[in-house]
């Protein structure tokens, strides 16, 4: 029955997709209120205004119409077919009952969030030689959507009419620069991180601040340190022109009390540290090979772009085990003292907390079996890396985990009800072989390694996991394991339910306290590699998730060959609700 309903709705969605400028009642769009700074600080319960809903990165909604007692009754309410081609890891924005989505083709659409009817659409003309892939998130501020594009531009689009206000080029996409996640607006400044900096571009990536009225750049932070400073001298003597990487490809969080953007920076390139010039370490005592600010949290003043502090989690990364992901801001005691914490989980699968006012390292917790880190200093967090996992040209090492990571771009959600964080992880290993440059060949991007991914020798066939951690004492609250990787962010709600999507095409709901599975959708059209949200429209709560399978998590399919996925299915947005 569910599959028949899905097919019927998808047919209607595909028919609707071709309608340009379709309208609902005129007052439906006129009723949208301008989004103020106060709304971003304290959003309406029924709105979802940014990537993780709130500045603190919790990914939590207080809505409780859907709860532990009735979530098993969820039914498909409507669906929307996205444009074909490319990856669509979409986070819809919902405000005043209107949903805004961005297709991989960069078609921007406004939908009635109660039924999926098209209100308006704006078709951005993405260049043919730019990557036809979606951008993970977007911002809404005032009357306007702020859209990042794959050709490294920022757009301002009127949320009521779909008309373009301004179009600002931030970087040259022909050199490899791109935006894969959208901005946040913090204290009146658009903050955007760049990616694509593995493509042999000198000096790495950057984070920029922009004026929402014009798109004009206000400040720029380079994510690869430079100059004759301890940070600039952390590249083993490698000249700036040969320093690569440091992508900021996941949106940051914002602490209004300190006016700080907390944002992650990715790994250096290439992953072979000998090729990157970071090994062997040179003898100059003034020089380190930490490669700052890669694999770090940067605390940036939202209005000036000044780096107030940084903390590096993994220096000299040769395995693409970056720490670029979500920054979750929580205020909880640690060692008997209330601490303002910023928490993240890197690809190794280790959760780490840092004081977000000072950058002081606080604590760490493993979520999977791993062989990369042997130990860490309990005061500083400095890690002792297993030398047997160092990649060496011409040799193969066993790394647990390796790319695409035990934890990746799909963020953990935090619930203030349970004071627990729900971390989607994958437990696996890889036989890793380093590629080398041929004589005279010049590095032009990429990691320069190959992987053969396998199950962990001490694990079982259930590689997918939700790790629920009690954030008050860092103890395990519960753990759920299954064969298929969990491939979406987790969505905890005021109803005591945690939602998550799976590679095997199921959308799942769990009890936030016990981990009991409470509901599962029927099989949807594809893997659920995206960011579920929940919102209200017309007083009714809905839960939405995008089905699409083209992310790096697909590399895990060699471990689970029995999970068959359609290779060329366009993305589909599914929206669920309780029956009337």
Q: Which residues does each predicted region cover?
A:
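Blade/loop signatures of beta-propeller domains
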Residues: 27-76, 223-230, 385, 455-456, ...
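Repeat-blade elements of multi-bladed beta-propeller folds
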Residues: 48-52, 87-107, 130-154, 178-201, ...
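N-terminal cofactor/phosphate-binding cores enriched in small/glycine residues
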Residues: 57-170, 493
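Extracytoplasmic beta-rich repeat domains
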Residues: 80-93, 121-142, 167-182, 222-251, ...
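Conserved blade-register residue in beta-propeller folds
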Residues: 110, 156, 209, 299, ...
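Beta-propeller blade signature
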Residues: 204-216, 283-286, 290-304, 359, ...
């Amino acid at each position: 029955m569910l599959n028949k309903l899905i097919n019927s709705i998808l047919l209607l969605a595909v028919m609707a997709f071709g309608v340009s400028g379709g309208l609902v009642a005129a007052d439906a769009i006129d009723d949208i209120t301008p989004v103020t700074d106060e709304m971003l600080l304290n959003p309406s319960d029924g709105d979802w205004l940014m990537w993780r809903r709130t500045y603190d990165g919790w990914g939590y909604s207080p809505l409780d119409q859907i709860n532990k007692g009735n979530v098993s009754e969820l039914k498909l309410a409507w669906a929307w077919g996205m444009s074909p081609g490319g990856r669509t890891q979409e986070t819809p924005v919902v405000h005043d009952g209107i949903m805004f989505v961005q297709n991989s083709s960069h078609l921007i659409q406004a939908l009635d969030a109660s039924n999926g009817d098209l209100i308006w659409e704006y078709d951005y003309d993405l260049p043919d030689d730019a990557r036809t892939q979606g951008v993970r998130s977007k911002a809404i501020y005032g009357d306007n959507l702020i859209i990042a594009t794959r050709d490294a531009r920022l757009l301002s689009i009127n949320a009521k009419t779909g008309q373009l206000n301004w179009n600002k080029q931030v970087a040259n996409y022909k050199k490899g620069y791109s935006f894969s996640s959208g901005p946040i607006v913090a204290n009146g400044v658009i903050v955007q991180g760049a990616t694509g900096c593995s493509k042999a571009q000198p000096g790495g990536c950057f984070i920029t601040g922009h004026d929402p009225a014009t798109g004009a750049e206000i400040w720029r932070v380079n994510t690869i340190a430079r100059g004759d400073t301890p940070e600039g001298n952390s590249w083993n003597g490698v000249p700036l022109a040969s320093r690569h990487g440091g992508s900021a490809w996941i949106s940051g969080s914002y602490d209004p009390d300190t006016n700080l953007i907390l944002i992650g920076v990715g790994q250096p390139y290439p992953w072979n540290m000998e090729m990157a010039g970071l090994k062997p370490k040179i003898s100059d005592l003034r020089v380190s090979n930490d490669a700052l600010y890669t694999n770090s949290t940067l605390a940036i003043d939202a209005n000036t772009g000044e780096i107030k502090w940084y903390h590096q989690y993994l220096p000299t990364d040769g395995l693409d085990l970056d720490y670029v992901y979500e920054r979750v801001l929580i205020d909880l005691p640690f060692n008997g003292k209330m601490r303002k914490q910023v928490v993240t989980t890197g690809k190794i699968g280790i959760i780490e907390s840092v004081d977000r006012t000072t950058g002081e390292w606080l604590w760490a917790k493993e979520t999977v079996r791993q062989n990369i880190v042997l130990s860490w200093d309990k005061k500083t967090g400095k890690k002792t890396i297993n030398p047997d996992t160092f990649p060496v040209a011409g040799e193969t090492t066993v790394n647990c985990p390796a790319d695409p990571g035990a934890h990746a771009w799909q963020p953990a959600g935090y619930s203030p009800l349970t004071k627990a964080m729900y971390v989607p992880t994958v437990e696996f290993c890889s036989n890793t072989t380093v590629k080398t440059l041929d004589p005279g060949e010049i590095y032009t991007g990429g990691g320069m390694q190959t992987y053969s991914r396998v199950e962990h020798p001490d694990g079982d066939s259930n590689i997918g996991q939700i790790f629920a951690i009690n954030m008050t004492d860092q103890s395990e609250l519960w753990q759920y394991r299954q064969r298929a990787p969990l491939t979406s962010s987790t969505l905890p709600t005021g109803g005591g339910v945690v939602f998550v999507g799976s590679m095997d095409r199921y959308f799942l709901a769990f009890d936030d306290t016990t981990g009991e599975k409470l509901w599962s959708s029927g099989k949807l059209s594809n893997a659920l590699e995206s960011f579920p949200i929940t919102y209200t429209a017309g007083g009714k709560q809905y839960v939405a998730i995008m089905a699409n399978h083209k992310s790096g998590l697909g590399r895990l399919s060699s471990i689970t060959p029995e999970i068959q996925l359609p290779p060329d299915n366009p993305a589909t947005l599914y929206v669920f609700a309780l029956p009337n």
